[in-house]
């Protein structure tokens, strides 16, 4: 396991997470994605590209009463090992992270097709004008030989028919994401994330239901900050209290 790491807290110290001092570290994106999952009453969850485990740890905390079985797939073995350590330190015995390269496919990663009720993912992306100087962080955010289409197709293969896929990504990726899901998943629910009023959305949260033909829905926008720069009341309920988006509507 990595010897140089920090212990940090999420959800107002409900979750203790261990992260590398240098390299990929969890952001608010992870907490927002975990809060977007709705309607779960039990079953199996797959976290693709699990990083430091922040998304699934936050989700496990919120869904504790349903005892979700969560599997995390992570390309960097040291992050998978550190995530398992975090899970045990938080008392979660039904979360397991494994080293996996999803570019190889489901079979090669011991992922049975159509076997998960929910798939969650923060797919890699590249901020073309802001390359990361850190190799670990760059790996987490950008697979140069593995595009968003292949990533989401892996999600579609892993989830059960009519199971749900939850992702967070750059706002400008919305047209591509909708194109990839077209004919394969429907009932899209799209939530735009804004830093403040009168600013463009930087992130989008999307829920897609495999094989569904239901129409797309645009949800009310979400603002993370107030005009004075502090977290909005709604954001505090998610980032600190650990509530889901459904709980604050």
Name each model-derived stretch:
Residues 36-132:
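Conserved SAM/SAH cofactor-binding pocket of Class I
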Residues 123-150:
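Mobile active-site "lid"/loop adjacent to the S-adenosyl-L-methionine
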Residues 19, 99-100, 169, 192:
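Short loop/edge segments at beta-strand edges and connector loops
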Residues 33, 122, 151, 208:
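Residue-level signal for inorganic ion chemistry
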Residues 16, 69, 94-96, 186-189:
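Conserved beta-strand segments of alpha/beta enzyme cores
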Residues 146-201:
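Conserved Class I SAM-dependent methyltransferase catalytic core
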Residues 200-249:
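SAM/dcSAM-binding transferase cores
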Residues 2-40:
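Class I SAM-dependent transferase core
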């Amino acid at each position: 396991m990595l010897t140089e790491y920090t212990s940090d807290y999420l959800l107002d110290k409900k979750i203790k997470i261990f992260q590398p001092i240098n390299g990929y570290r969890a952001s608010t994106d992870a907490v927002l994605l975990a809060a977007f999952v709705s309607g779960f009453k039990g079953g199996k969850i797959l976290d693709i590209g699990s990083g430091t485990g922040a998304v699934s740890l936050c989700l496990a905390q919120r869904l504790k009463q349903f005892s979700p079985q969560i599997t995390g797939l992570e390309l960097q073995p040291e992050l998978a090992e550190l995530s398992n350590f975090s899970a045990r330190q938080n008392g979660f015995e039904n979360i397991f992270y494994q080293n996996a390269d999803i570019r190889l496919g489901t079979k090669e990663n011991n992922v049975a097709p159509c076997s998960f009720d929910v798939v969650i993912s923060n797919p890699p992306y590249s901020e073309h004008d802001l390359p990361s100087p850190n190799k670990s962080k760059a790996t987490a955010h950008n697979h140069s030989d593995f595009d968003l289409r292949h990533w989401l197709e892996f999600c579609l293969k892993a989830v059960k028919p009519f199971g749900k896929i939850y992702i967070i990504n750059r706002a400008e990726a919305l047209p591509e994401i909708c194109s990839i899901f077209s004919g394969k998943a429907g009932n899209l629910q799209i939530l735009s994330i804004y830093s403040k009023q009168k600013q463009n959305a930087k992130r989008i949260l999307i829920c897609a239901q495999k094989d569904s033909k239901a129409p797309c829905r645009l949800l009310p926008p979400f603002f993370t900050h107030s005009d004075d720069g502090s977290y909005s009341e709604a954001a505090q309920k998610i980032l600190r209290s650990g509530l889901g988006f459904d709980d604050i509507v």
